[in-house]
A protein has these predicted regions:
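Short beta-strand element of the alpha/beta-hydrolase
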Residues: 118, 125-137
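Residue-level recognition of a conserved intra-blade site in WD40 beta-propeller repeats
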Residues: 5-7, 49
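Non-catalytic accessory segments flanking enzyme active sites
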Residues: 22, 35-123, 149-152, 156-157, ...
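Active-site-proximal cap/loop segments of hydrolase catalytic domains
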Residues: 163-287
Length: 287
């Protein structure tokens, strides 16, 4: 359960997607306000209040350089105490790439956030191929090292990695996430293309002739759709991608349930352009 009522202080504790992090917030009932807990990890996947002493909690989290780190949390002192870090020795033996935020302002004035991950033993005098990675369905690409698509894994193969969080992702505010509705690639494609070009211009160690892009599910759709919009990508990987929005809408519970929000009020018979013009199948001649 992502929400916990603390019977000691009367407040409610819950997990929040906060940009590319997973945080724990509490709702303070008396003041009707929200407060973020000052925890030690960027991505907290487990948080539990002690049943008999709710002023004490335990949580497990990680980030770009760690995973599965367990802490005890003192709610009164707002302090964390390390309980266990079973992967510490493993990560000490692995050379990880340096990661940092890289943001840009899109043509329409929107701040688009992202991160760069450099290869281990990075040499700024070299030219590196680039992998551009974006969200699927439309959850932000969270910080972390355990995903099969994590930036560190790509970087370990001697790639520079650009993780972009384009319009439509949750965790960046209601207006930003609502851009996903009845868009199917609008905004998102333009921002990925613009961001990739600006990223290359800002990083001379990137070989602009060797750029690849990758995404899964809706990100897989974006991979395919991008190939109909630009030729800047030398390689493209679409995992579980959608080529035909119409068949996706009508096949399986995932199609109609997802599109109930992603294409709210739109159907093939009342908004055919959304279902035809935004898929790679009906734009294959542009690839």
């Amino acid at each position: 359960n992502s929400a916990n009522w603390n019977r000691t202080d009367g407040n409610i504790y819950f997990q929040v997607t906060d940009e590319d992090c997973e945080r724990i917030y509490r709702y303070i009932v008396k003041t009707a306000s929200y407060e973020r807990l000052p925890l030690e990890e960027d991505v907290v996947k487990n948080f539990s209040l002690a049943a008999d002493a709710p002023q004490v909690a335990a949580y497990v989290g990680g980030g770009n350089y760690s995973s599965g780190v367990a802490y005890m949390y003192d709610n009164k002192k707002s302090q964390s105490t390390l309980f266990a870090n079973p992967m510490a020795d493993v990560y000490k033996a692995i050379e990880l790439g340096e990661m940092s935020e890289w943001n840009f302002t899109a043509a329409d004035g929107t701040l688009i956030k992202g991160m760069i991950c450099l290869p281990p033993s990075f040499d700024s005098s070299r030219k590196y191929p680039l992998i551009v990675y974006y969200y699927g369905g439309t959850t932000p690409t969270t910080r972390g090292i355990t995903s099969p698509y994590c930036a560190q894994l790509f970087a370990s193969r001697d790639y520079v990695v650009y993780v972009i969080q384009p319009s439509g992702a949750i965790g960046f505010g209601q207006e930003f996430s609502a851009r996903h509705v009845n868009a199917w690639g609008d905004w998102t494609a333009d921002e990925i293309i613009e961001g990739t070009m600006k990223f290359c211009a800002a990083h001379p160690f990137v070989d602009a002739k060797r750029i690849g892009c990758i995404g899964a599910s809706y990100g897989g759709f974006m991979t395919q759709y991008l190939q109909t919009k630009t030729d800047i990508f030398a390689a493209a990987v679409s995992h579980a991608g959608i080529s035909n929005v119409t068949s996706y809408w009508g096949e399986g519970y995932w199609g109609y349930s997802y599109n109930a929000i992603a294409a709210a009020g739109s159907y093939p018979w009342n908004n055919p352009d959304l279902f035809v013009k935004h898929g790679s199948l009906f734009n294959a001649d542009k690839i």
